[in-house]
C-alpha cells in the first residue's frame, strides 16, 4: 500500500522575493496607503460628523502630519500613543495577540543623482497603546482656566496685541487685522470662554497669514475656525461655538491632494501656535516653581 499524502505545511513557506519583487511590493503598499489617505480626505469633507471626529484625532495627535492623522483616523481614530513593534518591545510592552498594525508614512532622506538630499516616504507599521498590555498614558494636564489661557495665548502671540473698545464685528471678542499685523482684543468682555475661543481662532488667522505667501480672511476663515476648535479642544475649553459643521462647498469639491494640502496648512498653523503656548506654559510653570523655592 502506498501512502499518498501531502505534508500539512507544503507550499506554506513564503517565497523569498527578489530585490525587484520586494521593491514592487513596497511600491504597491505605499500606493495603497496614499489611496487610503485620499479616500479618507474626501470622506471627511463630505460628512460634518466625520470631519469633527478627524479634528479631534488631529488635535490629540498634533505631532503627526495631516496625512498621517487621516491614516490614523481611518484605522484607529481613538489612538493616543503610537510606536512600532521594536519600540514597544524596548519598553517591555507586548502587543496584544491579533492586533492589527496601523500604517502611516515615515519620511526618509536619500541622495539624488545630483548629490542633493531628497525626501521620500516609506510605510511604517505602528500600534497604539490600547493594542498592548501597557498602561494608557494619563491625559495631559491642560490649563482649563480660560482667563489664564487667554493670557498665555496673547503672551505667545506671533503678532502685536492691542486692547480696544470696538471691533469691526460687534459679536467678536478679538480680531486679527492683517494689514496692521495686529491682534485686537476687546476690553471688558465678561465671558472668558468666548474670549478664549475668539483669541484662538484669530491667532489661527494670524498664523495662516505668517505661513502663507498670500492671505485672504474670507478664503482662510474655515481653516481659522478649525484651528480655534483644535486649540480649545486641546486646552479643555468648550468648543460648541465653533461652526466646524459648515464645511465650505469649495473645500468639499476639491481633489483629494488639494484637501490634504489645506488640512496640512491648518495642522501646521495649529502646531505652531500650540508649540509657543506650550513653551509659555512651561516658562510660567518654572517661574512659579522658583517662587515656591524662595
Regions found by a protein language model. Name each.
Residues 2-294:
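N-terminal accessory/interface modules of nucleic-acid-binding and processing proteins
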